[in-house]
Amino acid sequence: MCCKCCGETQRKVWVFGLGSVFLLLGILIVVFWPGIADNLVEDGLTLKPGTDAYESWLEAPIPIYLSFYMFNWTNPEDIRNPDIKPNFVEMGPYTFLEKHKKENYTFYDNATVAYYERRTWFFDPERSNGTLDDMVTAAHAITATVADEMRDQRKIVKKIINFMLNHEGGKLYVTKPVGEWIFEGYQDNITDFLNLFNTTKIDIPYKRFGWLADRNESLTYDGLFTIHTGTDDISNLGRLTHWNGKSETGFYEMPCGIVNGTTGDMFPPKMNVNDEITIFATDACRFMNLRPRGTYENHGLTATKWVGTEETLDSGENYPNQACFCDEARFDECPKTGVVECKACRDKAPIYSSFPHFYLADQSYVDAVSGMKPEKEKHEFFLAVEPITGVPVQVHGRIQINMMIEPDDDFDIYRGVQKVLMPMFWFDQYAELSSELASKAKLAINLSSYGIIFGYSMIAFASVFLITGITLTVTKKWVRRTPEDEDILTN
């Protein structure tokens, strides 16, 4: 029997000893585990070989889709009739699976890494509404670019260019398959002529025109990125320091020309859900500020939605801090709110970007053409990011590309046409966190809580031991006597 092999003192030592040990361990866990857990999570999120973040950064672990919606210009022959608006019919989506892979990366001692990113696209017919052979009519981008570059030249120069446009295939509009409009590109007589007999006046840097021609599988198209790894300060994780080796883009006046923000695929943990976030868009050679607007639930995670607002694509009309995105010398010519000029960035072509269907843009752009139906649910640009870990949960990067067509009596092709910002296409870059990665994110979020719960459980367990010991001591019942023991004591 226990009472015969273990005395009262020994039992007290065991009960009070174990109770004290569990109590001490529980208190230590409750006090110190949150800091330890935070360090473990932050270490796993830093960009260095061996971490999960590093592996996910090297090659995107989730499918990314890029959907194109083309605008088919149905009445180009009426462009000189001021009573008839250009009419556009949306076609698509034409969806591509997008693969990202970091290459030629170099880690530096100042907690940064420089790298190129190769992006590859594969057409996904099942997610598309149409084929790449669908025909689309749109404004002739090469002709528009040449005319725009020559607009302020002397009359004699413009006469020569007008002759060239008339005899080398210059057109107001062109009809081509979707595939050629996007990645394949199409051969053009004007492009051939300018590449053969080029002058310093007109620079056409490509042999085939396509909105993303020469981009598929290109290593260098997006440029050289340098970002913070977060190894010295986790709050800097993913922040862009240089693009193509420079801290300024050279395309806009400061401070709009600064290389700022993240590339959109990595954010630091412990984000302030009341602050704006900044992403750098290489296609526009500029940063974009997104504002927090509510939350988004997915896979059991609660993410904060950061969205594009009226300020995001304003050029100073309503938000003076954005004025440096347009040339001060010709501020009166700057686009109205919701549309930004990309001419300097996009090979001098008269390209302007907006949100799809001119969502959040000045109403005049919507009214100038037929077929625009801006809707928040379909056309809002947003990133949903889990703020504790900085993990993107869902992304819809939606941008529309437009081209300016305007009259010029020195060019036969543009004589008498309406001045209109023509929608060409819009795209939606979409990605969603997988359930597997969401589970890892939830573990990281709750790791501190799990430890605290375990610590309090140990404290509760220790309390049972100690309360039991105190109770037995007060009632003097440490040794439970059996009838046999009573007989021994009474005889």
UniProtKB/Swiss-Prot annotation:
| GO cellular component entries | membrane; plasma membrane
Q: Which residues are glycosylated?
A: N72, N104, N110, N129, N189, N198, N216, N260, N446
Enumerate the GO terms in the molecular function aspect. scavenger receptor activity
Q: Which positions, given as ranges, span the membrane?
A: 13-33, 452-472
User: PTM details?
Assistant: N-glycosylated and/or O-glycosylated.
Which InterPro entries does the record cross-reference, listed alphabetically? CD36_fam (IPR002159)
Q: How does it sit in the membrane?
A: Multi-pass membrane protein
Q: Which domain of life is it from?
A: Eukaryota
User: Residue positions of S-palmitoyl cysteine lipidation?
Assistant: C2, C3, C5, C6
Which residues are exposed on the Extracellular face of the membrane?
Answer: 34-451
Q: Induction of this protein: by what?
A: Up-regulated in response to detection of apoptotic cells.
Compartment(s) where it occurs, according to its Swiss-Prot or TrEMBL record = Cell membrane
Instruction: State any further remark.
Output: 'Croquemort' means literally 'the one who bites dead persons' in French and is colloquial for undertaker.
The family classification in the record reads:
Belongs to the CD36 family.
Q: What is this protein called?
A: Protein croquemort
Please tell me the species this chain comes from.
Answer: Drosophila melanogaster (Fruit fly)
